[in-house]
Amino acid sequence: METQNTLRKPMDGTGTSPMTVLKRLWPYIRPLIGIVVLAVVTMGVVAATEAGIPALLKPLLDHGFGSHGSDSAKWYVPIAVIGLALVRGVSQYTSNYLLNYVSNRILLQLRLEMFQRMIHTGASFFQRETASTVINAIVFEVNQILSVLTGVMVTLVRDSLTVIFLLGYLFYLNWRLTLIVAVILPGIGWLVSKINRRLRRLNREHQTLTNELSYIVEETVGGYKVVKVHNGEAYEMDRFTTMSKRLRGYAMRMTISGGLAQPLTQFLASIALAVVITIAVVQSSNDQTTVGGFVAFVTSMLLVISPLKHLIDVNQPLQRGMTAAELIFGLIDEPAEPQGGGRPLSQARGEIEFRAVSFDYGAAERPTLDRISFKVAPGEMIALAGPSGSGKTTLVNLLPRFFDPTDGTILVDGVPVSDYDLHALRSQMAMVSQDVVLFNDTIAANVAYGQTPDRARVQAALEAANLADAVAAMPDGLDTLVGGNGMRLSGGQRQRLAIARAIYKDAPILILDEATSALDSESERHVQAALERLMEGRTTLVIAHRLSTIERADRILVLEAGKIVEEGSHDELLRHGGLYAHLHRIQYQQQAA
């Protein structure tokens, strides 16, 4: 299955360019501009030392050799070489350290902003984006920006200055020969521009396929039990192989495009070198150049080739960096969920009302919810029943504002939920989902998630959830690590730990999506008792799967195709003989079987 990466998009109307990326990075660079300037100065010193080497060769060859050689040239040139090497080494170390300091500071800021925006986006973001895409953006792709800030900047600044210094020295030595070398540069620039556009497109497609490959691995790891039980190893291997081969194809196309630049550039440079040697030989016969001048010129010209090659090779990491920037700033620019009207809500009574609420996901042919209206009194328990796809989960997701209704109003204590501060509203709600989510932390931290653990309250919550004895038997008690998503706990323990978390929060409104996973009778009994304690005295909306839960509800709302088609108590709905009675009969027969 292919996923669409909606985070990665051009950063302006004309597409992503280095200048666009620089503009986005400027607010992060500006506070550190003094350090950046110092790094550029030290890189300039490094570049200047490149031109210093051939500059020392000329007097050495012209005046330091032979019986008539200058004694001063014999000694000051070697000493100057050592001095140049020392200055170059210190400057290179300083520039590398300063740039890495700047880039790591910016990397930290970007990573923190990305994670902060990710946790404050709406639920639609998590439905739209795969986990592998978000993980790649925050953990891996942001390092491409680090590569741009260090390696690419070093290349662009230091090697550009090196080329400028060397070309300046070449003009000083022999401007006629230098013009021949300069003729080659436009040809190199044309090659770079042609290769540049293709590399950018290939990089974008390559990184999209990398996310696809990560998604396949993520699905296979997460669903390993299904893979093994259904003998899906061959199918998953085929999926992975197909995507890996596509990824390899794009990698080879990138290698071909990126690899052409260097040999073509070197070929053009060799033509220039051959012409220079020919003309220099003619000039030397007319005493227009010296041996030292010729060697210094050829040395300078050869020294120009390496930084030019680096400047050309910078395209690939630069394009990867710009492609990564699209993903990074796509996440940073993702709109945050609305924070509400700012009205405080310190302690809700628990009164809930839906007034003609409708909702659709945009692509659906019919609304997921169609003009739903009902009212829940404080402390009342409402069970939601209905066939799969009837809108039960969507309905409960609207209450904590994971989504906002497309029409109608939801009220808590007589006030529209949009008027409340979002955090204040959610602080009045606890949720126990069908898919239990636990964090790779201690028992205590999972129970008190989002708050500072009070060990006495944690212990009380565990006792109410019938989990205290099991935790006490663990080697580290409350400090026991549960593993990734509670993998070190049994299914019943995971469910009861999620219930303990809701008990610890002690919110007046409870949203419960009962788990349908089969448990042994002992675990089922413990979970059911914990749920009953959890629901005591709380306004509860429960998507009920157990007959016992449905039967003890104050009212049952039966949904079908996004509408409430029946409402009443368990006995009333059975007597009515409608959809609920039909669903009840099917479930009763399944349980009896």
Swiss-Prot record:
Gene Ontology MF annotations: ABC-type oligopeptide transporter activity; ATP binding; ATP hydrolysis activity; ATPase-coupled lipid transmembrane transporter activity
Keyword terms of this UniProt record: ATP-binding, Cell inner membrane, Cell membrane, Lipid transport, Membrane, Nucleotide-binding, Translocase, Transmembrane, Transmembrane helix, Transport
InterPro entries: AAA+_ATPase, ABC1_TM_dom, ABC1_TM_sf, ABC_transporter-like_ATP-bd, ABC_transporter-like_CS, ABC_transpr_lipidA, P-loop_NTPase, Type_1_exporter
Reaction catalysis annotation: ATP + H2O + lipid A-core oligosaccharideSide 1 = ADP + phosphate + lipid A-core oligosaccharideSide 2
Keyword DNA damage recorded: no
Annotated residues for binding of ATP: G386, P387, S388, G389, S390, G391, K392, T393
Bilayer disposition of the protein: Multi-pass membrane protein
GO CC aspect terms: plasma membrane
TM helices/strands, residue ranges: 33-53, 75-95, 137-157, 164-184, 262-282, 292-312
Compartments where found: Cell inner membrane
Domain ABC transporter span(s) in chain numbering: 352-586
Enzyme's top EC category: translocase
Domain ABC transmembrane type-1, residue spans: 37-320
Enzyme Commission identifier(s): 7.5.2.6
Summary of the function given for this chain in its UniProt record: Involved in lipopolysaccharide (LPS) biosynthesis. Translocates lipid A-core from the inner to the outer leaflet of the inner membrane. Transmembrane domains (TMD) form a pore in the inner membrane and the ATP-binding domain (NBD) is responsible for energy generation.
Similarity comment text for this entry: Belongs to the ABC transporter superfamily. Lipid exporter (TC 3.A.1.106) family.
Summary of subunit composition and partner proteins: Homodimer.
Comment field on protein domains: In MsbA the ATP-binding domain (NBD) and the transmembrane domain (TMD) are fused.
NCBIfam families: MsbA_lipidA
Identification of the protein by name: ATP-dependent lipid A-core flippase
High-level lineage: Bacteria, Pseudomonadati, Pseudomonadota, Betaproteobacteria, Burkholderiales
GN (gene name): msbA
